[in-house]
UniProtKB/Swiss-Prot annotation:
Keyword Cytoplasm (UniProt): no
One Pfam family this sequence matches: LrgA
Membrane topology (UniProt): Multi-pass membrane protein
Organism: Serratia proteamaculans (strain 568)
Transmembrane segments: 4-24, 30-50, 63-83, 93-113
This protein's name: UPF0299 membrane protein Spro_1570
Family: Belongs to the UPF0299 family.
Keywords: Cell inner membrane, Cell membrane, Membrane, Transmembrane, Transmembrane helix
One GO CC term, this protein: plasma membrane
NCBIfam families reported in the protein's UniProt record: PRK01821.1 (NF002494)
InterPro entries: LrgA/CidA (IPR005538), Uncharacterised_UPF0299 (IPR022957)
Length: 135
């Protein structure tokens, strides 16, 4: 019985901590003059707490595993809600497809150039050049 109570406490604590970060993010978003969603601010707050180890990762790990395990079910209502606007999506299908293609190509180009920049061949300090080695 004690083991069951401990397990329930871990799940409850994890979900409460995640929701507290979400509610804090919503409160901060309501106070800010810029339009950043509260869920994004809450996620950044949770990330900051975890990365500075103010909140140990083991406290939220059970809740995160639970949410990730059933993430597919969380997207079903969103998909059904999108189908409510099927006629509008069909009317604007061309611009939607073009914007998806352009944004995908832009991401590919930026990632390609960034990858080339960070993985370029660099000179090793103190190693003689090939031209100097031949002399």
């Amino acid at each position: 019985m004690a083991k069951l109570f401990t397990l329930c406490w871990k799940y409850l604590r994890a979900i409460v901590l995640i929701y507290l970060c979400l509610f804090a993010g919503n409160a901060i978003a309501a106070l800010l003059p810029i339009a950043i969603p509260g869920s994004i601010i809450g996620m950044l707050l949770l990330f900051a707490l975890l990365s500075t180890q103010i909140m140990p990762a083991r406290w939220v790990k059970p809740g995160c595993h639970l949410l990730i395990r059933y993430m597919v079910l969380l997207f079903v209502p969103i998909g059904v809600g999108v189908m409510k606007y099927y006629d509008q999506i069909l009317d604007h299908l061309g611009p939607l497809v073009v914007s998806c293609i352009i944004s995908t190509l832009m991401v590919l180009v930026v990632v390609g150039y960034t990858s080339h920049y960070f993985h370029r061949e660099r000179r090793i300090v103190g190693k003689p050049d090939a031209a100097e080695g031949e002399k």
